[in-house]
């Protein structure tokens, strides 16, 4: 068996294309005693020719006709350049440096591969003694060696492309399954975090995303929006769900007790410390620590918390040894922490440590479409707790609730529904009259108005100066209170829209209500914008 056929048998056993290229070039260099050899391959985007060996850091454009490779690609014909002919190919610096070692009796052979087709997949560059290279391409065994490489190269590339497609398909299916699982989790959350508004759907998606990460979560929202529910949901959907969820309200505990609650203490640490007590940080090991109203945490304690977050170690009060705790931190606040940072009331370094994954909860007034679902849920809960059969809310009661701004958000709605259910006979619906008198009148800017006391049969309601009409109204002509209130409200909104030339944003701001609420009232009261 000739040398080249022996070399060919070595190539057949290679199973990786990059290994095949390296071995092919090494065998060529060895068999022809070359000064240099390269296999040039197309880049991933097909715009460049790059060496088979990634350690050789150079490349040529496939359209750069200052080098012979572009001509070979275009013609699919080999090119043989002697030392004298290389003089005319010196404009490209990289090619000039590559061929600088070509001597008087040497030459450069540039061969497109495979040799028997115009479908070029690579270019072979050989540099060495001219007679030896030319003779090799007249040797049948050498040509068979080149053919074996080309066939093996095509086979391995086809197999690798197929494997890549299989992996991409598998990854695509994995992504689809993950997205489907996340959607399922988000849908499951709708039983706890109720609402079909866009804001609530986005919130549930954020919770699922946050749960899948290991980042510290900051839950922001007004009082009554459900911050602890969100924190608990992040824990329940995370990999730590089987470990403890430990919660503490930083605003509900005196400053001098908060540190001992968090860090725990050792016996004798202070007067009354008769035994060791494990702190909440230790209790949360493996699980989640929820710090509610973290904006009320004292500055001195903020520094200690930051150290715990950075080192994952802590020392109980009176303790001499550092202890470790692996916990996920979820914190919440209803205040603007960034303002507190500017006022030097909250540490900036802790602020950035807490805000790795911020989640902002929407106000109830910003998702009026969810009020009916929430109300039905609270009625069902009331029925279960009190063994009653309240049949939901009357549509007028729903309309009444949708006109209210809910400064106390979902918690206030819950209490209103419970109050209404308590006054409703079993088997009937909750009427608007059950809680309407508890709804605070929305403020209206009217500095010229004077206070007017309205007397009704059930109770006296003193209207604020800002919401009373100027002059003395004739209450004797009022026989439908709800209609009178609606007309009064329509007059105020119409006046304000006229004042601002139909600009609903300015009108809503002047009335102290969200633009969405104003739009709802205009639709309900059939108010036309000027």
Curated annotation (Swiss-Prot):
<keyword id="KW-0804">Transcription</keyword>
<feature type="binding site">
    <location>
        <begin position="221"/>
        <end position="228"/>
    </location>
    <ligand>
        <name>ATP</name>
    </ligand>
</feature>
<dbReference type="InterPro" id="IPR025944">
    <property type="entry name" value="Sigma_54_int_dom_CS"/>
</dbReference>
<dbReference type="InterPro" id="IPR002078">
    <property type="entry name" value="Sigma_54_int"/>
</dbReference>
<dbReference type="GO" id="GO:0032993">
    <property type="term" value="C:protein-DNA complex"/>
</dbReference>
<dbReference type="InterPro" id="IPR027417">
    <property type="entry name" value="P-loop_NTPase"/>
</dbReference>
<keyword id="KW-0547">Nucleotide-binding</keyword>
<keyword id="KW-0067">ATP-binding</keyword>
<dbReference type="Pfam" id="PF02954">
    <property type="entry name" value="HTH_8"/>
</dbReference>
<dbReference type="GO" id="GO:0045893">
    <property type="term" value="P:positive regulation of DNA-templated transcription"/>
</dbReference>
<dbReference type="GO" id="GO:0000987">
    <property type="term" value="F:cis-regulatory region sequence-specific DNA binding"/>
</dbReference>
<protein>
    <recommendedName>
        <fullName>Transcriptional regulator VasH</fullName>
    </recommendedName>
</protein>
<dbReference type="InterPro" id="IPR002197">
    <property type="entry name" value="HTH_Fis"/>
</dbReference>
<dbReference type="InterPro" id="IPR003593">
    <property type="entry name" value="AAA+_ATPase"/>
</dbReference>
<dbReference type="Pfam" id="PF00158">
    <property type="entry name" value="Sigma54_activat"/>
</dbReference>
<dbReference type="InterPro" id="IPR009057">
    <property type="entry name" value="Homeodomain-like_sf"/>
</dbReference>
<dbReference type="InterPro" id="IPR025943">
    <property type="entry name" value="Sigma_54_int_dom_ATP-bd_2"/>
</dbReference>
<dbReference type="GO" id="GO:0016887">
    <property type="term" value="F:ATP hydrolysis activity"/>
</dbReference>
<dbReference type="InterPro" id="IPR025662">
    <property type="entry name" value="Sigma_54_int_dom_ATP-bd_1"/>
</dbReference>
<feature type="binding site">
    <location>
        <begin position="284"/>
        <end position="293"/>
    </location>
    <ligand>
        <name>ATP</name>
    </ligand>
</feature>
<dbReference type="GO" id="GO:0005524">
    <property type="term" value="F:ATP binding"/>
</dbReference>
<feature type="domain" description="Sigma-54 factor interaction">
    <location>
        <begin position="193"/>
        <end position="422"/>
    </location>
</feature>
<dbReference type="GO" id="GO:0001216">
    <property type="term" value="F:DNA-binding transcription activator activity"/>
</dbReference>
<comment type="function">
    <text>Transcriptional regulator of the type VI secretion system.</text>
</comment>
<keyword id="KW-0238">DNA-binding</keyword>
<keyword id="KW-0805">Transcription regulation</keyword>
